[in-house]
């Protein structure tokens, strides 16, 4: 039996400014590490921002409704 923990996905939030966490082409491994450090299962660079999969349900992600950029 496989248990799926957290299924939210979205852009990684830069808490310092409320924007999406920026990235450049070729920085997928960096985004993957950053996403995992914020409780996501994996991530990649969806230029120009890091996109993460498998956030836990209580994780904070970038949200268009509260966008401050």
Curated annotation (Swiss-Prot):
Domain LCN-type CS-alpha/beta: 8-69
Keyword Disulfide bond in annotation: yes
Single GO molecular function: toxin activity
Compartment(s) where it occurs, according to its Swiss-Prot or TrEMBL record: Secreted
SMART domains attached to this UniProt entry: Knot1
Keywords, in A-Z order: Disulfide bond, Ion channel impairing toxin, Neurotoxin, Secreted, Signal, Toxin, Voltage-gated sodium channel impairing toxin
Intrachain disulfide bonds: 19-69, 23-45, 31-50, 35-52
CDD domains attached to this UniProt entry: neurotoxins_LC_scorpion (cd23106)
Keyword Kinase: no
Entries under PROSITE patterns matching the protein: LCN_CSAB
GO BP: defense response
Extent of the signal sequence: 1-7
Chief subcellular location: secreted
Tissue expression from the record: Expressed by the venom gland.
GO CC list: extracellular region
A Pfam family this chain is assigned to: Toxin_3
Domain of life where this protein originates: Eukaryota
Family listed: Belongs to the long (4 C-C) scorpion toxin superfamily. Sodium channel inhibitor family. Beta subfamily.
Function noted in UniProt: Beta toxins bind voltage-independently at site-4 of sodium channels (Nav) and shift the voltage of activation toward more negative potentials thereby affecting sodium channel activation and promoting spontaneous and repetitive firing.
Domain statement: Has the structural arrangement of an alpha-helix connected to antiparallel beta-sheets by disulfide bonds (CS-alpha/beta).
More about this protein: Negative results: does not affect the cardiac Nav1.5/SCN5A, the peripheral nerve channel Nav1.7/SCN9A, and the voltage-dependent potassium channel Kv1.5/KCNA5.
Protein name per its UniProtKB record: Toxin Tz2
């Amino acid at each position: 039996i496989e248990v799926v923990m957290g299924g939210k996905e979205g852009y990684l939030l830069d808490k310092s400014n409320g924007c999406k966490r920026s990235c450049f082409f070729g920085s997928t491994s960096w985004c993957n590490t950053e996403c995992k450090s914020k409780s996501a299962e994996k991530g990649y660079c969806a230029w120009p921002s890091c996109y993460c999969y498998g956030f836990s349900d209580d994780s904070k992600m970038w949200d268009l409704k509260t966008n401050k950029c």
